Swiss-Prot record:
GO cellular component, as recorded: bacterial nucleoid
Protein name: DNA repair protein RecO
Superkingdom of this protein's organism: Bacteria
Stated family: Belongs to the RecO family.
GO terms of biological process kind: DNA recombination; double-strand break repair
Disulfide bonds, paired cysteine numbers: none
Functional note: Involved in DNA repair and RecF pathway recombination.
Organism in which the protein naturally occurs: Rippkaea orientalis (strain PCC 8801 / RF-1) (Cyanothece sp. (strain PCC 8801))
Keywords of this entry: DNA damage, DNA recombination, DNA repair
Length: 273
């Protein structure tokens, strides 16, 4: 049996190990998560130094080890240099990497997850200075949770299975969102559920629900195309922040861990919760 194997993968995490080595966690479409040592990667003249950095995609030759595999060759295919040029984008990319590390598994193909992460990292790179990181993060988290099979239900009530649509005619209208329930909960007294209502973690208004229900599409919704003109106001930016935080907390609830890089995104945005 061969003691080496080939893989293509993106570096999601790295840490020093030994005197000059680096321990990396890689997402590979063929093999899923791989943990491997990059020998001498911390030496200034090492050929593998730049190839073992965060978000670099390589063709790899890996030697199997008793406890840890070892990367013996790496040829870079792609990287995301613009992420490291702006701290907010870098923190956002690390946030997505933390989420993917929770969702991915080892020794199983993860091609769909791999391609989706690459696409959302590319979108983060392309965000202009006037665009919201939170809107892109909200959709990225929604897509990643959906592909892992734990995405929230956002079109029907989780208890009654009644279709829910945003009510823009009543400014006081709200719909509930429950982490335990798995998504939306109808709060209307006209159609009460027959089963006990789980804890409501957040109430959403019409703008937030409309945006949330469009996150499943391939690209971000254009507010002017889905919202009435009177809803295109300053609250739109707040709505994206609230939705990103909602989906983050939903993911943390179901995965049982927090994302430290997301807290840095909040700090850089000047947000307090």
């Amino acid at each position: 049996m061969s003691r080496t194997y080939k893989a293509t993968g993106i570096i999601l995490k790295g840490m020093p190990i030994g005197e000059a080595d680096r321990l990396v966690t890689i997402l590979s479409p063929e093999w899923g998560l791989i943990r491997a040592v990059v020998p001498g990667a911390r030496k200034s003249k090492s050929r593998l130094r730049g190839r073992s950095e965060l978000f670099v995609i390589n063709d790899l030759l890996i030697a199997k080890g008793r406890s840890l595999d070892k990367i013996t060759q790496a040829d870079t295919l792609e990287s995301y240099p613009k992420l490291s040029q702006e701290l907010g984008k870098l923190a956002s990319g690390q946030y997505l990497a933390e989420l993917v590390l929770c969702l991915a598994v080892s020794e199983q193909p993860q091609g769909e997850l791999y391609e989706l992460l690459k696409e959302h990292l590319r979108r983060l790179e392309d965000i202009s200075s006037g665009q919201s990181l939170h809107s892109h993060l909200a959709q990225a988290v929604f897509h990643l949770l959906a592909i892992a099979g734990i995405g929230p239900q956002v079109h029907r009530c989780c208890l009654t299975q009644e279709t829910l649509a945003a009510n823009f005619s009543d400014p006081r209208w709200r719909v509930g969102f429950s982490f335990e329930g798995g998504g939306l909960i109808n709060l209307s007294p006209q159609n009460p559920p027959q089963t006990p209502v789980p804890r409501i973690n957040q109430e959403l208004g019409a703008i937030e629900l409309c945006l949330l229900q469009h996150l499943g599409y391939s690209f971000l919704p254009q507010p002017r195309q889905i919202l009435p003109p009177e809803s295109l106001n300053d609250f739109l930016g707040v709505a994206w922040v609230r939705l990103e935080l909602l989906l983050r907390n939903y993911a943390q609830y179901h995965l049982g861990r927090s994302f430290r890089s997301a807290e840095l995104v909040d700090t850089l945005s000047g947000l307090e919760f």
